[in-house]
Amino acid sequence: MANSQLDRVKGLIDSLNQHTKSAAKSGAGALKNGLGQVKQAGQKLILYIPKDYQASTGSSLNDLVKAAEALGIEVHRSEKNGTALAKELFGTTEKLLGFSERGIALFAPQFDKLLNKNQKLSKSLGGSSEALGQRLNKTQTALSALQSFLGTAIAGMDLDSLLRRRRNGEDVSGSELAKAGVDLAAQLVDNIASATGTVDAFAEQLGKLAMPYLTLALSGLASKLNNLPDLSLAGPGFDAVSGILSVVSASFILSNKDADAGTKAAAGIEISTKILGNIGKAVSQYIIAQRVAAGLSTTAATGGLIGSVVALAISPLSFLNVADKFERAKQLEQYSERFKKFGYEGDSLLASFYRETGAIEAALTTINSVLSARSAGVGAAATGSLVGAPVAALVSAITGIISGILDASKQAIFERVATKLANKIDEWEKKHGKNYFENGYDARHSAFLEDTFELLSQYNKEYSVERVVAITQQRWDVNIGELAGITRKGSDTKSGKAYVDFFEEGKLLEKEPDRFDKKVFDPLEGKIDLSSINKTTLLKFVTPVFTAGEEIRERKQTGKYQYMTELFVKGKEKWVVTGVQSHNAIYDYTNLIQLAIDKKGEKRQVTIESHLGEKNDRIYLSSGSSIVYAGNGHDVAYYDKTDTGYLTFDGQSAQKAGEYIVTKELKADVKVLKEVVKTQDISVGKTCSEKLEYRDYELSPFELGNGIRAKDELHSVEEIIGSNRKDKFFGSRFTDIFHGAKGDDEIYGNDGHDILYGDDGNDVIHGGDGNDHLVGGNGNDRLIGGKGNNFLNGGDGDDELQVFEGQYNVLLGGAGNDILYGSDGTNLFDGGVGNDKIYGGLGKDIYRYSKEYGRHIIIEKGGDDDTLLLSDLSFKDVGFIRIGDDLLVNKRIGGTLYYHEDYNGNALTIKDWFKEGKEGQNNKIEKIVDKDGAYVLSQYLTELTAPGRGINYFNGLEEKLYYGEGYNALPQLRKDIEQIISSTGAFTGDHGKVSVGSGGPLVYNNSANNVANSLSYSLAQAA
């Protein structure tokens, strides 16, 4: 029996649903097709009653008329019979809704037939309705639902029409839009009232929020929403719609007395997981409360069914976007406080957009979710008690259509919010006479100066200059870009803005716009002019700065609601820098972007042309092409501060000193600053989108191709510091000063008196002709001196030093296990710390040994005037040993002196000392001098160890090896060493990296000077 009743009820409900859906579908179609008629007739719902109509059994014509009048529905009694009237209005007797000249027609016979199809359901509804709304019966409920739905549809269509006209350029006043927006909101409230079940039930909910229920028809928006929270925040027009939607949805969720009163969903307050849970709880509790009021079952099983259906109807995923909007608004508002003090409120404007659209999104999402949950809950309740009601069917039928109308209206509201922001921007620009977005970049820059002041103020001291000219670039700002896109002002913004600031004594100078901004730095024309500055100066690009030129933007439509603001760069081919004329200066171009790729993938580069002054300058170059006219003074070009690629420096064709061509090879592993075009996507609602193109930069490979070459021309540059990669240097016929910096470099001095530094890495350095100075630096280096007098210093590492020609040569091994080869001229050898091997030549050689050195092996192949200087050892601290044909010199360690070969104190091995050379070759060192000036001659050592004497070792002091009491060999030795050093021409003091602040050159890395001074000092002390 129960099953048959259940089947019957389900069948009746399905039938009612089908009729209602069909009616609603017909109504929606009629609305669309009859929009023009509606506007002419007014937004009215008219109940048409034919003269031959008699109400169905169980209903009365008077009830129908009273219900219509209570709801403000016009009643029209026709003189025509039902069939004629139906065909005139609807074309058929089966339709529920249609259009007449006076408004929307509701056919009474068909409506009555729908409501009274099942007597049992009608009676059941009557009891429930009476308990909740007294005389407001099923007829009034159904009429109210249809009336509010149709009103919302018409209001929404009217609103869309007004917006469309405005977009097409027609003069649509704000008051018209405001009225249409308010009408839409009013009809929305009526819809919710119908969906709740009865008007009284909805009034009861709102009454719990202290809003008195005034009239059954809910006529007058102020009466409907009086005393609701947060309404004071709503402005005119669409702002009112936004506020109304928020408070309506909030009141709907929070109406239940058992719900968490602190939960403020969809009213502009944070939506969290807890709130999402309470939404389901509130709706479930409300449905159960209705069942109690209706005297229906509230068993645990029924409650569980209701709760599960409601939970399925409300998806937390639908609220994620809402929560994101409110969180974004919160973050933006906090962020905006930093820049308001600098006169920019764009971030706050953007926050307001997210707040308002978030409120709209929250309201509509919540309303849709609650309507769906309400419909699902009513259906579950009906199933649980084997009863149903026409209102449940009506709710189920119309909620989907209502949701569609709300969603369509949302886009229009979003666009209105965006328009409001655009109007505020226009008002600001009119008042201040300045681009709003440029003002945003100005504020960003002011904050940047505030944040980096400590760093920037240190440049004066760090670079030893009186004035710092600091150039910075505010790159594309996503917040500024988003605001420009939302307000449809993408063509009014730029990719950023470049700034110039001045510091003296660590203090920021007040700028004089005409003098500083326009004259000193012009990024549109690509000009920098420092010629008026009469101080030692640093020009520094602190942040990456875009290529010079003008940006042009064009906004165009790419789809129905899609727009693109395209970027075109009218770029300059070069920067021109006019330097400080009468004072030393530093120019740091390492952050000045020279390489660019446009949106089509075409590559280009911008040259930097520098005209420097008459004093000592330092210039730090980047990865693109440069032309440097350094002028007088000692000028230095640096390539090691950024990745400039694999470099070749060539001065072989130079006609003047300081002329070089620098070729830059940017391979795949070279990462350089390059300018690129990117796109920011901005959405205004679901359908409208803006794309903005802008310039940005990346640090990534930039392989040159298509005939593009990176090449520098250096003029009057006295000194060059290479890159941190493997470089090649080819000197000129003039004096060259090269520094390899890091990397395994190849350096060829060629002609001229060259000064060549390998620095870090395993370098190969050829001095070429001329008096050259070669320093290996760190790493295992190979140094080769050519014709002329050479000074070679291996530095740290296992180095090889060679000289083949030259009258005077200095060979310093430095730390490490080195090999030194002398020439047939006069050589000064100093192997340094480590175990070294030294090959003397046929000329006059001087070998220097210190007690901290390791085991040195000397191969002396000729000459008859060689000297070994024990620079900090006396003869009492050494012993001489004959081992085969070799002479060993051991040094005392810890007071003990041993006379055998395998001994840590073994200092020197002079190979083949006792071996007769071919054709009288002399393998001996003719004189050995200790730190006190005492000396011993080679023949005396040979005689002591002659065959038959039985002596193969002895202490120098014991054998009285020194000649002549009071005779000192050091003065003459000092003269000899000084002659060798001065003859190399390497210590004139006029080279090295420039110290700008001192006003003159500073010898850099001049270990040769250090050694010479050390030798001279030790000899002077001994003398």
Curated annotation (Swiss-Prot):
Coiled coil: none annotated. Hemolysin-type calcium-binding repeats lie at residues 730-747, 748-765, 766-783, 784-801, 812-829, 830-847. Keywords: Calcium, Cytolysis, Hemolysis, Host cell membrane, Host membrane, Lipoprotein, Membrane, Palmitate, Repeat, Secreted, Toxin, Transmembrane, Transmembrane helix, Virulence. GO terms for biological process: symbiont-mediated cytolysis of host cell. It is found in: Secreted; Host cell membrane. Palmitoylated by ApxIC. The toxin only becomes active when modified. GO terms for cellular component: extracellular region; host cell plasma membrane; membrane. SUPFAM superfamilies: beta-Roll. The chain crosses the membrane at residues 226-256, 297-326, 367-406. One of its GO terms (molecular function) is toxin activity. The keyword Iron-sulfur does not apply. It is a multi-pass membrane protein. Belongs to the RTX prokaryotic toxin (TC 1.C.11) family. One of the virulence factors of A.pleuropneumoniae, which has a strong hemolytic activity and is cytotoxic for alveolar macrophages and neutrophils. The Gly-rich region is probably involved in binding calcium, which is required for target cell-binding or cytolytic activity. The three transmembrane domains are believed to be involved in pore formation by the cytotoxin. ApxIA is partially deleted in serotypes 2, 4, 6, 7, 8, 12, and totally deleted in serotype 3. This is RTX-I toxin determinant A from serotypes 1/9. The gene is apxIA.
